[in-house]
Regions:
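Catalytic-core regions of core metabolic enzymes
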Residues: 1-248
C-alpha cells in the first residue's frame, strides 16, 4: 500500500490530488510542476529532485515526450512505481507507429526495475488504502474488502465505479498499453491481498499467456473467482483494440 504519492503535470494530476484527499488518504502528497505555484492547494515543487524523498507511487500526467525523463529520475531516486497517463506510444498507428514504439522502448528502459503501469493508462483506484491515481471523478468509496477490477479501458473502469448495484470495489486498475506491468502481474498482486474476494477482467490483449495461465491457476488454488470478458475477437473489434491500447 502506498504511504506517499507524487503527481506530475496539471491535467489529471489535480484530480489525483483531490480524489485521494476526498477518499481519506493520510500520507503526504507532493505536486511537481515547473510552472505552477500550486495544485489543489498543495505547493508545487519544481522537479523530481525537489521531492523530500522517493514516493511510493507516482501519477505521471506529463506529455509523451517528457514521460521518459520523469520516469528515469523517479527510478534513480528509488520510487516505488509510476502510472503513465499520457498517450502517444505503441498504440499509435500508420506513419506514427515507429515514433510511438520508440517512445515506449525508451520509457521501458528509463523505468529499469521500477514498476510502471501504462502508458496510455487512465488510472488506478485503491479503495482499501484510500489512494487514487485517477484523472477524474469516480464512484468508489473506502472499503475494507471487495473485488479487484482490471480493465484496459478507462471509460469502462469509470463507468463501473459509478454502478450502484454490485459488489464493493477494492481495486480499479486500468492497464493501458501494458508496456511493462501486465494483467498477470496485477492479478498476482491482488491475490497477495487477503482483502480481495474476487477478480473481474476486461481484456483486450494478454502479453504473456504463460504468466496469465499461472496467475489464473494460482487464483483457482486460492479459491478466488475470476470473471473475464475478452474483447477484440472479431476482425473489426481486433482493429479497434489495436488502436486503443496496441493489444491483440
Amino acid at each position: 500500500a502506498p504511504k506517499s504519492i507524487a503527481v506530475f503535470g496539471s491535467r489529471g494530476a489535480d484530480f489525483a490530488i483531490r480524489e485521494s484527499l476526498a477518499m481519506g488518504f493520510e500520507g503526504p502528497i507532493w505536486s511537481v510542476h515547473p510552472q505552477r505555484e500550486q495544485l489543489m492547494g498543495i505547493k508545487c515543487l519544481q522537479s523530481v529532485t525537489d521531492l523530500p524523498h522517493a514516493p511510493d507511487a507516482a501519477y505521471v500526467a506529463v506529455n509523451a515526450e517528457s514521460a521518459s525523463s520523469t520516469v528515469a529520475q523517479l527510478n534513480e531516486m528509488g520510487a516505488g512505481g509510476a502510472l503513465l497517463y499520457a498517450s502517444g506510444f505503441s498504440e499509435l498507428s500508420d506513419e506514427l507507429k515507429i515514433v510511438g514504439l520508440d517512445r515506449q522502448q525508451r520509457l521501458i528502459a528509463a523505468a529499469g526495475d521500477m514498476p510502471i503501469i501504462g502508458p496510455n493508462c487512465y488510472g488506478v483506484i485503491n479503495a482499501l488504502d484510500r489512494a487514487v491515481l485517477w484523472p477524474d471523478q469516480h464512484g468508489c468509496q473506502p472499503v475494507d474488502k471487495g473485488v479487484g477490477i482490471i480493465t484496459q479501458s478507462g471509460n469502462i473502469g469509470l463507468n463501473m465505479t459509478m454502478q450502484k448495484v454490485g459488489l464493493p470495489i477494492a481495486y480499479m486498475f486500468t492497464m493501458g498499453n501494458q508496456a511493462q506491468v501486465d494483467i498477470a502481474n496485477v492479478i498476482d498482486a491482488m491475490l497477495d491481498d487477503p482483502r480481495v474476494s474476487a477478480i473481474g477482467l476486461h481484456i483486450e490483449g494478454i502479453p504473456d499467456l504463460v504468466a496469465f495461465d499461472a496467475a489464473a491457476r494460482r487464483a483457482l488454488s486460492l479459491k478466488i473467482p475470476i470473471v473475464a470478458i475478452k474483447t477484440g475477437r472479431t476482425p473489426a473489434a481486433a482493429k479497434i483494440a489495436l488502436s486503443h491500447t496496441s493489444s491483440l
